[in-house]
Amino acid sequence: MDTSDLFASCRKGDVGRVRYLLEQRDVEVNVRDKWDSTPLYYACLCGHEELVRYLLANGARCEANTFDGERCLYGALSDPIRRALRDYKQVTASCRRRDYYDDFLQRLLEQGIHSDVVFVVHGKPFRAHRCILGARSTYFANMLDTKWKGKSVVVLRHPLINPVAFGALLQYLYTGRLDIGVEHVSDCERLAKQCQLWDLLDDLEAKCEKVSEFVASKPGTCVKVLTIEPPPADPRLRADMALLADCALPSELRGDLGELPFPCPDGFSSCPDICFRVADSSFLCHKAFFCGRSDYFRALLDDHFQESEEPAASGDPPVVTLHDISPDIFIHVLYYVYSDHTELPPELAYDVLSVADMYLLPGLKRLCGRSLAQLLEEDSVVGVWRIAKMFRLARLEDQCTEYMAKVIEKLVEREDFVEAVREEAAAVAARQETDSIPLVDDIRFHVASTVQTYSAIEEAQQRLRALEDLLVSIGLDC
């Protein structure tokens, strides 16, 4: 498994393997194991300075005075590593993955793009989105539909509501993450109780206990900021956001979704501000999500409105007609935009991939790549590899060449594979007789990387001989 491989490579200090896993296999740099440890922690603990610097430069988190930051500092094996950690300036994972979902939600919170309500807490304003608050909290859903209904500004003057704690609460509702100074933890717990966020309350209590034990057992450490992060496989945030996609579905396409948390699409609903018409179906959506997730929709909705139509009735959201897409395919776009996930059957993956490319949704393209990877067989691997090349899906391309390496002795007899090798050779500009061919190099790499025992050496040599014989037979030397 790639995640286990990442932790093992960090303990060994294998920078090349870690780089491959992060950049080619798309493994999350801040993933945690069952001991709540990160790849950066193991790199620090085992004294691999070069790897520590690489991880920090690629989005590994190590904020000062947090539990993770202090733990890395305390466990660091050398002074140069400690200096690197103290000099750390956060580089977010969005530098590697431009559409990173957590980064999108954080920007939505900080910038308030297309917000429709402002909370003023003791004079400090907080711009927010009714749809997100309602989807994440039944308390906010009820208040926005009753006491705060129709209000664009909500003033909160209660003396026990701390603006810092309220801001942290919004951060949790938007991102599933919470950063709060230890001096404000009690204020945050009070708000969590008031808003009936029992999961947050449990997480705060558990984190306080863990930090207290850590500080007591590690003299000299100082934790000033408490950080709550959802576990890697935690579905709560995305499941809540997917409720907004449920509400956006036309009634004729809703199927067996069951009882929804809001009366969709009438009444309170999810407060949509844009309607996408796809064929004969209307999807009631939110500009904040579509503009924030896609440069295509940002240009369409913010920069100009050439394809919009006048609303059918006063108060209805404006309508934009989308062409060259069916409702069945748009549903996958919809769920990805809101929840960063969609259940994508392999037979639809290529159609969704083409639309994701048109709508500038690289993350959805990667999901399509994962689905296409399920189709890898001797008969299909070359075709899937061509798709990966065409749509620049590096992980899928790597998976294809890895599979090719396993079945290379059969592939060399297939005309589609031979033609792919010829095309790759021709694509190398001004190729000399001994220049390498990328496809061949990748297959060789995966053949060599599988060698773990003496018996595997002979098998690898047989595979490489089959590949070399093919190259000779078609007049290529590389």
Swiss-Prot record:
GO terms for molecular function: translation elongation factor activity. Residues 115-182, 272-346 form the BTB domain. One of its GO terms (cellular component) is cytoplasm. Pfam families: Ank_2 (PF12796), BTB (PF00651). It comes from the Eukaryota. Keywords: ANK repeat, Coiled coil, Cytoplasm, Elongation factor, Protein biosynthesis, Repeat. CDD domains: BACK_ABTB1_BPOZ, BTB1_POZ_ABTB1_BPOZ1, BTB2_POZ_ABTB1_BPOZ1. May act as a mediator of the PTEN growth-suppressive signaling pathway. May play a role in developmental processes. Residues 451-477 form a coiled coil. It is found in: Cytoplasm. It comes from Mus musculus. InterPro entries: ABTB1, Ankyrin_rpt, Ankyrin_rpt-contain_sf, BTB/POZ_dom, SKP1/BTB/POZ_sf. ANK repeats lie at residues 1-31, 35-64. This is Ankyrin repeat and BTB/POZ domain-containing protein 1. The keyword Nucleus does not apply.
